[in-house]
Amino acid sequence: MDKNIKEIIKNMDLKFRNIDGKKLLLAISTDKQKNVLMTAFMSEESLEKSIETGYMHYYSTSRDKIWKKGEESKNVQKIIDVYRDCDGDALLFTVEQTGWACHEGYMSCFHNKIDLNTGDSTVIGTKLD
């Protein structure tokens, strides 16, 4: 790994949290209009790959591995900007989304609106696949 990328990450002053025995932080991706597309975890290695390639890489706790967003679907996320939260344990990425972000075929993973009076959910948005 390029030493420069490790320096960049060090300068970001991040606080990776112990989640399922792994050092992870929360990554949120939005489009240019600031619509939330998805959230996932990142490890330091997936963050390195994201910086190195310019495309989002996440850490899957269920598969216990790093994955490039769109490696199977081709619905990749090209990084435009990144913001660190005040605690340093979450990153907000502005991305250029190719295709849809959700593996269920919706633009956003947040397509289930919950009624707080009943707990019932309603699918909003259009399935794109």
UniProtKB/Swiss-Prot annotation:
The entry lists its GO molecular-function terms as: metal ion binding; phosphoribosyl-AMP cyclohydrolase activity
User: What is this enzyme's catalytic activity, as reactions?
Assistant: 1-(5-phospho-beta-D-ribosyl)-5'-AMP + H2O = 1-(5-phospho-beta-D-ribosyl)-5-[(5-phospho-beta-D-ribosylamino)methylideneamino]imidazole-4-carboxamide
Instruction: Kindly list the cofactors needed.
Output: Mg(2+); Zn(2+)
EC number annotated for this UniProt entry: 3.5.4.19
Q: Which residues form the signal peptide?
A: none
* Pathway note: Amino-acid biosynthesis; L-histidine biosynthesis; L-histidine from 5-phospho-alpha-D-ribose 1-diphosphate: step 3/9
Per its UniProt record, what InterPro entries does this chain match? PRib_AMP_CycHydrolase_dom, PRib_AMP_CycHydrolase_sf
Broad class of enzyme this protein falls into: hydrolase
Q: Which Pfam families match?
A: PRA-CH
Q: How is the cofactor bound?
A: Binds 1 Mg(2+) ion per subunit.
Q: Where does Mg(2+) bind?
A: D85, D87, D89
Q: Which GO terms describe its biological process?
A: L-histidine biosynthetic process
What do the Gene Ontology cellular component annotations say?
cytoplasm
Tell me the compartments it is located in. Cytoplasm
The residues listed in the UniProt record as binding Zn(2+), with positions renumbered to this chain, are: C86, C102, C109
Its main localization is cytoplasm
* Keyword Hydrolase belongs to the record: yes
Q: What does this protein do?
A: Catalyzes the hydrolysis of the adenine ring of phosphoribosyl-AMP.
Known partners and oligomeric status: Homodimer.
Name of the protein this chain belongs to: Phosphoribosyl-AMP cyclohydrolase
Q: What is the lineage of its organism?
A: Archaea, Methanobacteriati, Methanobacteriota, Methanomada group, Methanococci
Gene transcribed to yield this protein: hisI
